[in-house]
């Protein structure tokens, strides 16, 4: 294991790494993905996405999974913009 990987492992729990690896290989939100989150990771989809959002803000995660972090960041920004648009209409 490289020094960078070892440092990353020390900063993240095994469950965090499993979650990030799962998201990296399952990027689309579907009912099947939600079922897999429940059965493979043992958490609710809501908690999964909360934790994913927390993790991708960490520099170590951005360094190890840059495409994943960028994708999640873009999705979050798009949702923020959509909510802001809705607020203007209310």
Language-model regions, residue ranges each:
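Amphipathic, hydrophobic secondary-structure cores in small proteins
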Residues: 18-74
């Amino acid at each position: 294991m490289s020094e960078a990987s070892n440092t990353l492992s020390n900063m993240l729990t095994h469950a965090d790494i499993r979650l990030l690896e799962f998201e990296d290989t399952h990027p689309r939100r579907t009912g099947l993905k939600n079922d897999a989150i429940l059965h493979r990771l043992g958490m609710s989809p809501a908690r999964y996405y909360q934790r994913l959002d927390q993790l991708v803000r960490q520099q170590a995660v951005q360094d190890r999974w840059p495409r994943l972090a960028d994708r999640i960041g873009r999705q979050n920004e798009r949702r923020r913009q959509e909510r802001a648009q809705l607020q203007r209409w209310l």
